């Protein structure tokens, strides 16, 4: 591996870097804002000084081994996003990165469609394209439409405090909030660690324009009337520790939700987060706040017509949908086929599969081991499927520990069985259930010992089965059962 080439600064594309760099310390190549965000992350892990980094401008190329990689300007829900044209001895492979076609971006230039067309005219072996919105017809709206929505909201809510939750990385969104705040004479407070860090980085690098005296510290809010304040905060996905969730739960140290507050969710729930977002909305509504969660967000990913445009400009021989769940990849494959790319030239890949490409053929030739490496506290990779399964089991049904003492020489029962439970039932209110469970274990243990079983693993298995059978019969639950046998000399 010669280097990491990063298309943009979203967490799902850069979050693993500090952990991977500890294993293979190789250079990072990316654009200015993306590098600034990465450097913040490397500082947290004390890796900044020892990591080689090179900032690349759109239109520039880098050389890695036999490959030349060109960075192409695109649009996305974070600034400085890039597509990659990878020039290899076998041909050119274009990777769109996460992208949309935005003809009127808030900051910088529109996607460089001309460069895509120029590369397409010279011949492209394969196109790897963003599949996130491949099921959606039409075009993705411009980010500027959200600014129009913000302007309407600010105009209609001039007598209330505004709290806006959005993705920390969406600098364009933050810029439009600041623009509206300045227009309507409001001070802006930024809350949430990730939000503060990215806004600070974007401002320092010239990607965010903040009028003088517009941003204030959260401790200065008390110096201004609520209707002259707007808070930009994290927590748009209902994350339990994010700033907005803590406000909703009345555990935020600096902000208390008031009945006349207006809260705007400038995001759509990521699949899987719907319940968390709904919980926060309900908590905020119960406090009397007005919650707005419609028409204040647009996607950063291309819909079908934008995908068709890129396919038409690039004219690839092979199509490789990327970045999405299987159904998204399949929808993207359908777009490619609708434009005349033969079915046998469209590849929906599984993680780990190795695709061999040349002008004459393309085929899957191997599969390498892949999978999730989980980070838990200071541990990296030490939590696997078995541990996750046990945690899920504990979360759903709790745990019962059966403790008994046997004489070492004869296996005679000296004490117990005692039962300790957590997360199953409240013992003081279920004494009869626990007493009967002890009897069930004692009877099973007595049969086992009469059969002269001396293998403690066998005895533990008998105890576990007896407890499981009894608890299921009485409660229709399956808590985790752990037998503990202590032996003593008498």
List the model feature ranges, each with a label:
Residues 1-5, 10-223, 242-256, 275-278:
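His/Asp/Glu-rich metal-coordinating catalytic cores
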Residues 73, 404-408, 488:
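Short, low-complexity Ser/Thr-rich regulatory SLiMs
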Residues 53-55, 126-128, 263, 291, ...:
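Conserved beta-strand scaffold positions in the cores of enzyme catalytic domains, especially
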Residues 452-460, 464-490:
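C-terminal tails and terminal domains of large nucleic-acid-associated
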Residues 136-452, 460-461, 465:
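Hard-cation-handling environments
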Residues 42, 336, 471:
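Conserved hydrophobic residues forming the short capping helix/wall of the S-adenosyl-L-methionine
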Residues 66, 81-83, 399-401, 481-483:
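Broad gene-expression machinery/nucleic-acid interaction feature
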Residues 57, 192, 350, 485-488:
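A general secondary-structure junction signal
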């Amino acid at each position: 591996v010669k280097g990491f080439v990063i298309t943009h600064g979203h967490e799902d594309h850069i979050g693993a870097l500090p952990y991977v760099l500890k294993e293979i310390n190789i250079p990072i190549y990316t654009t200015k804002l993306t590098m600034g965000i990465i450097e913040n992350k490397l500082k947290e892990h004390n890796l900044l000084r020892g990591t080689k980094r090179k900032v690349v401008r759109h239109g520039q190329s880098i050389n890695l081994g036999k490959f030349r990689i060109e960075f192409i300007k695109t649009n996305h829900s974070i600034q400085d996003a890039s597509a990659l044209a990878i020039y290899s001895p076998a041909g050119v492979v274009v990777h769109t990165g996460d992208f949309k076609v935005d003809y009127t971006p808030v900051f910088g230039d529109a996607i460089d469609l001309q460069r895509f067309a120029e590369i397409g005219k010279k011949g492209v072996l394969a196109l790897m394209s963003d599949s996130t919105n491949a099921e959606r017809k039409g075009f993705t709206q411009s980010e500027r439409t959200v600014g129009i929505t913000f302007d309407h909201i600010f105009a209609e809510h001039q007598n209330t405090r505004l709290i806006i939750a959005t993705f920390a990385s969406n600098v364009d969104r933050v810029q439009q909030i600041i623009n509206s705040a300045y227009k309507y004479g409001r001070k802006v407070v930024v809350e949430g660690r990730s939000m503060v860090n990215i806004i600070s980085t974007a401002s320092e690098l010239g990607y965010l324009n903040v009028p003088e005296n517009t941003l204030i510290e959260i401790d200065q809010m008390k110096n201004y009337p609520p209707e002259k304040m707007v808070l930009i905060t994290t927590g748009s996905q209902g994350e339990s520790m994010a700033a907005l969730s803590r406000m909703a739960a009345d555990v935020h140290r600096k902000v208390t939700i008031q009945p006349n507050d207006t809260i705007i969710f400038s995001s759509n729930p990521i699949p899987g987060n719907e319940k968390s977002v709904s919980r926060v909305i309900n908590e905020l509504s119960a406090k009397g706040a007005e919650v707005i969660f419609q028409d204040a967000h647009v996607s950063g990913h291309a819909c079908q017509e934008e995908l068709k445009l890129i396919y038409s400009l690039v004219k690839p021989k092979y199509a490789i949908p990327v970045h999405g769940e299987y159904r998204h990849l399949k929808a993207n494959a359908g777009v490619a086929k609708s434009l005349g790319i033969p079915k046998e030239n469209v590849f929906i890949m599984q993680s780990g599969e190795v695709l061999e490409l040349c002008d004459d053929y393309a085929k899957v030739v191997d599969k390498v081991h892949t999978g999730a490496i989980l980070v838990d506290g200071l541990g990296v990779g030490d939590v696997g499927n078995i541990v996750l399964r046990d945690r899920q089991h504990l979360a759903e049904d709790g745990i019962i520990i059966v403790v008994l003492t046997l004489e070492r020489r004869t296996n005679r029962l000296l004490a117990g069985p005692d039962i300790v439970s957590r997360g199953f039932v409240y013992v003081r209110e279920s004494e009869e259930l626990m007493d009967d469970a002890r009897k069930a274990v004692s009877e099973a243990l007595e049969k086992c010992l009469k059969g002269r079983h001396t293998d403690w693993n066998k005895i533990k298995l008998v105890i576990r089965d007896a407890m499981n059978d009894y608890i299921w019969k009485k409660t229709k639950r399956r808590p985790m059962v752990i037998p503990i046998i202590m032996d003593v000399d008498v």
